[in-house]
Amino acid sequence: MATTPLLLLLLTAVFLSTEITAQRAAPAPGPAGPINITAILEKGGQFVTLIRLLNTTQIGNQINIQINSSSEGMTVLAPTDNAFQNLKPGTLNKLSPDDQVKLILYHVSPKFYTLEDLLSVSNPVRTQASGRDVGGVYGLNFTGQGNQVNVSTGVVETRLSTSLRQERPLAVYVVDMVLLPEEMFGERKISPMAPPPKSKSPDVSDDSESSKKAAAPSESEKSGSGEMNTGLGLGLGLVVLCLKFLL
């Protein structure tokens, strides 16, 4: 009977030592790796075109650097491949490299927003494209209620369908349309290549023609002067004849 408590003590000691050893052997969780926007989009599985544009414009690297160094965070609105396919043919190819950069930056806000934040945010919301053009706002307008949030550019309007990530410092929301800024695609936008409207000026050739017509005597004037000359000649002839008879 005396050996039973001793046996229990030994088993308890063995159990405790095993627990301590296991705790020491368990590796401590390492720090989380840097956030990568491309990796997040690749995991989403329907953003091939957007990833390509992020790489060719180098905006993907800029986002990664700013996300991991800024305290404000960022919000990305990610158009799907279908969204790009629904654009008019040649829309992207017609854009200059600088305009392509502005188009992608227009989908990025330099601040972290939850869906709840976007429902009460002051419009227009600044984007990374804001301030790149003189007088260009490049802002986004958010409206909605409940869990539905809509975004409008002045040219297109769509809703934020799903969230790929909504954790500081980065929020990524899926949109079903490419966000076209009014500064680039609005109806009132004048193409920089369009010639300026010509001011209507008097035609020099018309003036010269009219002056020639004014200077040239009309047919009636010509006939009138001819008749006058004929009358004067007859009168002088009669005077000469009368003088001859008198003399």
UniProtKB/Swiss-Prot annotation:
Residues the record marks as carrying a glycan: 36, 55, 68, 141, 150
Short name of any one Pfam family annotated for the protein: Fasciclin
Keyword annotations: Cell membrane, Glycoprotein, GPI-anchor, Lipoprotein, Membrane, Proteoglycan, Signal
Membrane topology term: Lipid-anchor; GPI-anchor
Any one GO CC term of the record: plant-type cell wall
Lipidation (GPI-anchor amidated glycine): 224
Superkingdom of source: Eukaryota
Domain called FAS1: residue spans: 34-179
Subcellular location: Cell membrane
Residues excised as propeptide: 225-247
Region described as Disordered: 189-228
The UniProt record lists the keyword Cytoplasm: no
First and last residue of the signal peptide: 1-25
Its job: May be a cell surface adhesion protein.
UniProt family annotation: Belongs to the fasciclin-like AGP family.
Identification of the protein by name: Fasciclin-like arabinogalactan protein 13
Species name: Arabidopsis thaliana
Lineage: Eukaryota, Viridiplantae, Streptophyta, Embryophyta, Tracheophyta
